[in-house]
Amino acid sequence: MSGKPAARQGDMTQYGGPIVQGSAGVRIGAPTGVACSVCPGGMTSGNPVNPLLGAKVLPGETDLALPGPLPFILSRTYSSYRTKTPAPVGVFGPGWKAPSDIRLQLRDDGLILNDNGGRSIHFEPLLPGEAVYSRSESMWLVRGGKAAQPDGHTLARLWGALPPDIRLSPHLYLATNSAQGPWWILGWSERVPGAEDVLPAPLPPYRVLTGMADRFGRTLTYRREAAGDLAGEITGVTDGAGREFRLVLTTQAQRAEEARTSSLSSSDSSRPLSASAFPDTLPGTEYGPDRGIRLSAVWLMHDPAYPESLPAAPLVRYTYTEAGELLAVYDRSNTQVRAFTYDAQHPGRMVAHRYAGRPEMRYRYDDTGRVVEQLNPAGLSYRYLYEQDRITVTDSLNRREVLHTEGGAGLKRVVKKELADGSVTRSGYDAAGRLTAQTDAAGRRTEYGLNVVSGDITDITTPDGRETKFYYNDGNQLTAVVSPDGLESRREYDEPGRLVSETSRSGETVRYRYDDAHSELPATTTDATGSTRQMTWSRYGQLLAFTDCSGYQTRYEYDRFGQMTAVHREEGISLYRRYDNRGRLTSVKDAQGRETRYEYNAAGDLTAVITPDGNRSETQYDAWGKAVSTTQGGLTRSMEYDAAGRVISLTNENGSHSVFSYDALDRLVQQGGFDGRTQRYHYDLTGKLTQSEDEGLVILWYYDESDRITHRTVNGEPAEQWQYDGHGWLTDISHLSEGHRVAVHYGYDDKGRLTGECQTVENPETGELLWQHETKHAYNEQGLANRVTPDSLPPVEWLTYGSGYLAGMKLGGTPLVEYTRDRLHRETVRSFGSMAGSNAAYELTSTYTPAGQLQSQHLNSLVYDRDYGWSDNGDLVRISGPRQTREYGYSATGRLESVRTLAPDLDIRIPYATDPAGNRLPDPELHPDSTLTVWPDNRIAEDAHYVYRHDEYGRLTEKTDRIPAGVIRTDDERTHHYHYDSQHRLVFYTRIQHGEPLVESRYLYDPLGRRMAKRVWRRERDLTGWMSLSRKPEVTWYGWDGDRLTTVQTDTTRIQTVYEPGSFTPLIRVETENGEREKAQRRSLAETLQQEGSENGHGVVFPAELVRLLDRLEEEIRADRVSSESRAWLAQCGLTVEQLARQVEPEYTPARKAHLYHCDHRGLPLALISEDGNTAWSAEYDEWGNQLNEENPHHVYQPYRLPGQQHDEESGLYYNRHRYYDPLQGRYITQDPMGLKGGWNLYQYPLNPLQQIDPMGLLQTWDDARSGACTGGVCGVLSRIIGPSKFDSTADAALDALKETQNRSLCNDMEYSGIVCKDTNGKYFASKAETDNLRKESYPLKRKCPTGTDRVAAYHTHGADSHGDYVDEFFSSSDKNLVRSKDNNLEAFYLATPDGRFEALNNKGEYIFIRNSVPGLSSVCIPYHD
C-alpha cells in the first residue's frame, strides 16, 4: 500500500476529460473518509447497545419537529463510545449529540468531521472547490471556492442551487449525504473579513454548522452568539418556512447559582447544597472539552401563519445534573417524558434511563467503558463478552449469539454470526465496509454488486442465479429496475431532481407536475388513465386541498403545531379533531355532532375509547406497553408474555386458554388451542417451514432453489404440486381430490399481468377431461383490467371514468347496467335493462346520511324500497320497508342480540344469546330451563334442535336430532355425518334415518380449496318399489374467477354470475341451457390452425405469443376491423386477412336469459329482475342468512346467500369458500384455516352480520359489506403455516402487505404499519401489519424481524382520515424524519393512502414513486367515525 492519493475528481483522464466517478481524497492504504462510528454496520442489541463498540446508544429521539420545508428538528442521540478525536461537548451534555453538533476540525495533516451521530470522519486536506466522498459513510465534503462543478458531476445540480457567496467562499465547507441535499453549511460565528480590512481577522481552526440549504434555494439559519459566555453557541434558529425559535442556553455557573438559591430558599434544611456538589465550572471529559453550556428550553418566537397565537410555554425543556449531564426532558405540557442516570465516577456514562410510565433500564460497564450487561426488570436482559474479533451476546433466557468481526473502528463489520440455535450465517464487505455478499445458514450465497464510488446497489444475484439490476442517473437517483423476469420499471426526474414520471413493471405511467420551482411538492399527478389530481399546499408543506380527477375537493385544517383539526369532504361530510396539551388525540366529532373520546395513561398508551353512546372499551398494558387485557361491554380478553415479549398464553372471554411455545430463534413451534388441539411446526436452517403436525396429520413442505414451494405431502401421500415458468411466475397447481386430478392453470401477458385462469378436472386413470372452465382477463391501454371474458360468454366490459370509478357494464357490447355517482363517487342511481340509463324498467336510487352512511335505497317499484336508521355509534338499528320494519338491538360489545319485526298486526322479537366468547346459547327468554352458560372449548355440543360431535381437529362430524327430555324415543331421529380430507375440507356428507341413508353427497376441490364439483345421491323408489339411493348422482360443476364463484353447471343448464368489481356482491345472472351452449361450441382460430397444421394429424403447438396474436386477429376479423399491425405481421408471414378469415368458424349466439341481482346492503340477493323489470324470483332472509320465504313461480335455481356463500340443499349448509357455514347456528362447522389470524373464536361468523361479512370463510370482515374484498389470485390461507410470501424487492413485499391491509385500515379507520425484512437469500418479506394499542398512529419500528433476518424497510397506512399531525394522502414530516434517520437502517418507507396510492420514500426522505396500486376509499368503504 503506497498511501498515495487515488484519483481526484478534478484530475484529467488520458483523453482529456474530468474523472467524475473517482473518489477524491481516498488514499490507497490510508483511512481517509472512514468514520470512528457510533454504530459501525448499524448493529444494535436489546434496548439498545452497540455490541461492536460495547457502547450504550440511543438513536435519535425527537423532541421538536414542526412541519415545513427544511424544518427545525431538535433531536438527541447518545453514545457512551469515546472517539479518539472528539468534538467539544454539546448543549445536551457529555455523550449526547444534537443535529447541529456538526464540527469540522481543520488540521495541517487533514480534516476531521465530527457529525451529530458521534462519528469522527477523517479526510485529507481539500483545495478550494475540491470535493471528497467517503464511501464507507456515504458522505460528501466540499470546500467552497468554485462557481460550478464539472458537467456530469454527482453534485453539479446541488452545487448550482447554492447562493454564489457560499459557493465562491474558500473559507466555507459543505457536507451532504445525498446528491439531492440538503447541504450542511460549515462556517464560523466570527465576523467575515471585509474587503476594506487591511489584515483579515484570523479564522478559527474549526468550522461549525451555520445553516442548511436545499436544492430549491431554501435555507435554515442558525444564529450563533459572536461574543460573551455563549460565544459560538446557537441561540436562535429560523427554519425554511420562516418560523423563528429562541434557544435558551445556560452556563454551569448560572445553573450552580440557581441551585444554591433554590437550596437556600428550600424549607428542607436537612440537605444543604455544598459548593462542591454543583461547581461553577466543569472539567473536560472523555467526550471532549466542556464549556458547561447547556440547552434549557426552546421557545417559538415567530410563526408567519399564526403570528398572534404563539405558545405561552416552551416547546421543550431540559434539566441537568450538577455534572452537566442531561437529567430529564419535559414536553410542551411540562410533562417529564425522559429521565437519565449516570455513573458518578465517569461523567456522561449512562447507567440507566426511563421513558414516562415505563420501567428503568440499567447498564453495567467494565473497566474499559464497554457495556457488559443491560438489565431489564420487565423483559430480556443481556450480557456481553468481548474477545479479540469476537463478541458473545447472551440473553436472560440463556440464548447465545456470537458475532465474529473483521476490521477496526468504523470499518468493523460482523462477518460471521452464530445464532442461538447453532446455525451460522456469513457476510462479506468491500474495502469501504459495504455489504457485498451474504451466505445463509444453508450455505447459499446472495451477492450485491455496488457502484464503486457511490455504493449504490447495481445488481443483486440470489442463490438460484436470478439477477435484479438497478440503474441510476448522475445524481445517484434510481432510474430503472430490471427484475429477474425481465420486466422493467422506470423513473424520470427534472433538473432539480424531482420525480416527473414513474412507469411500473406493467407499463402504466404516472406523471407529476410542479408549479413552484422552489418546492418538491407536486401540484398535480396524472395517472395512466389520464386522470389528473390537484394539490394545494400550505407554506409548511401541509395539504390544504386535494382535488380529484372529477374536480371534487377535500379540504384540511391544522393547528399551530401542525396537527390536523378538520377534514371537509364533498357532500357535507366533515370530521373535527381535538388534542390535549401533549398533542394526543382526545376526540373525534363528525358533522352530526357524534363524538368519540380517547384516554391515555402516563406512558401515552391508549387506555380507553368512549363511543358516542358512552360505552367504554378499556385496555391495560404491561410495563413495556404491550396490551395485557382488553375489556369491552364487561367482557375481557387477556394476553400473557414471556421475558422475550412473545405471547405465551391467550385467555378468552370464557376463561379458556390457548398456549404457545417458541424455539431459540423466536419461531412458533407449538400451539395449543382453546379446545386442546395441538399443532407443531419445524423449520429448516433458513427458517422455512418444512414440517407441520396437526394431531395425526404430518405435512412435509418442499421448495426449489428460489425458495418457492414446489410440493407437499400429507402422511407420506402426495398432495399439492406447484409449477413455475422461466420468469418465475406460477403457471400450474395440481393435486388429487377424491380420486380426480384437479389443476389450475394461469396465463400471463408479456407484462406479467394475469390474462387467464383455467380449472380442469381429469380422470387420473384414463386422462379423460371431465370439466374445464376458463376465465380471460384483458386490459385497456391505460392498464386497467376493464374486460373479463367468462367461460362461454361474451366479454364483460366495465365502463369507467377518471381513475377507474365504475360508470357502467356491457355484456358482449350490449349495455346492461349504468351508474350515476355523487361528488364522493358513491353510487346514487343504478339502472338496468335494455333501456338502462334512460327509461330503465329498473332504477335504484341510493341516498346517504351526512356522516356517509347508507340512508335509503328506493326503486321505481316500491316493493323493494328500504330506509336505514343508525345509532350514534354507527350501528344499524332499523331497516324499514313497505311491508315491515325490523329493529335491531346490540350488546355493549357490538354483537347483534335481538331483532324485532313490526308489521300490521305483527310484533315479534327474536333474541340471540351467546356465551362471553361468542358461541350461541339457548336464549333464556325462549328456554328458561336451560342451564348452559358457556362452551369452554368453543365447541357447541347441543342446542334446542340437535346434538353435535366433533373430532380431534374440532371438525363437526355428527349432528343428530335432539330428543327433548320426557319424549318417548321412536328411533326416527335423523343423523348427519360429515367426513373431511387432510385439509379439513368436507368431502362426504350423508343423512341417515332408521339406519338407511336418505341422501349422500361427495365434493371435489381444486388445490386452492375451491369446490369444483359435487355429486348427490338421493333416496328414491326403484323399479321394484324399494327405496334406495339413486344409482346415478346429480352432478354440479363449478367454475371460478379468483375467489368468486362465477359458474354453476348442472345436467341441464349453466348459470353464470358477474359480480360488482372488487366485491362479492352478485350483479348479473346469465342462464344458458346446455343444448344452446353445445350449438355455440366452436374452435378458436388458433385451435383450428394448431389442430389442422400437421400432415400426420397429430396437430402442432403454437408459442403463447402466437396464440395471443391469433386471438386478437380473430376478434378483429369478427368485428371487421383488422388493424394495420395485424396486417403487417400477416404480410411478413406471407398470409392475407382473407386466407385467415376463411379459417374462422362461424359463431352461433345461444339464447340466454339475463337477470339483475337486487341485493341488500350486504350483498345478499333479495330478487332477480328481468330486463323488462319483472321479478323472476324473490326471497326473504333473517339476519344470519336463513331463508324465511321464497317466491319462485319459474323454479329458478338461486343458490347464493350472504356474500361468498352458496346454499347446498342436500345438507342445509352454505359453502363459504374455505369452510361450510351453518346458518341455523350462525357459525362454521370447522375451525378457521387461518388460525388465530382470523379471530380468537375459530368457528365464529361475524357477530354483527348486518354490517360485517366473511365472504372467504376466513373471518376477514369488511364493514361495508357491498364494497370490497380481496378477490384476486390465491388467498393467503397457508400463510400462517408456510410463512410470508417473499419477493425480489422491498417495494413488492410492501405492496403485497399494503394490499392485504388497506381494506381493514380504511374500514376501521386505523393506521397500520409493519416492516420489510430481508432473509439470507436476499429475498424480502413483510411482517404482519399491526396497529399500536388501538392508536390512530402506528410506529413500524416497534416490529422486529425474525432472528437471522434484517430489517430493511417499513410500510404503513393512513386509515381513512388521519387523526394526528399528518396529511392523509402523503408522507408526514415525522414519516420523513423516520426514514432519514440512519440509526433505523431503512432503505425505503412505503405508504398506502386513502385515495388508493402506493407511495415510497428513499432513505433520504425523498419521494421515489407514487402510483395507484392499492384499494382506495371510494372503492372500499367510507367509515362514519374513527
From Swiss-Prot:
Sequence repeats (start-end): 334-356, 357-378, 379-421, 422-442, 443-464, 465-485, 486-506, 507-529, 530-550, 551-571, 572-592, 593-613, 614-633, 634-654, 655-675, 676-695, 696-715, 716-738, 739-762, 812-832, 833-861, 862-882, 883-905, 906-941, 942-970, 971-995, 996-1030, 1173-1197
Composition skew (Low complexity), residue ranges: 262-277
UniProt-annotated stretches for the region Disordered: 256-285, 1073-1097
Sequence ranges of Basic and acidic residues compositional bias: 1073-1085
Record's note on what induces expression: Repressed by H-NS, induced by LeuO. Part of the rhsD-ybbC operon.
Keyword line: Repeat
Region (28 X approximate tandem repeats), start-end ranges: 320-1197
Disulfide bonds: none
One Pfam assignment: RHS
GO BP term (any one): cellular response to sulfur starvation
PANTHER family: PROTEIN RHSA-RELATED, PTHR32305
Primary role: Rhs elements have a nonessential function. They may play an important role in the natural ecology of the cell.
Domain notes: Each rhs appears to consist of a highly conserved 141 kDa amino fragment followed by a highly divergent C-terminus.
NCBIfam families in alphabetical order: Rhs_assc_core, RHS_core, YD_repeat_2x
Stated family: Belongs to the RHS family.
Name listed for the protein in its UniProt record: Protein RhsD
Gene giving rise to this polypeptide: rhsD
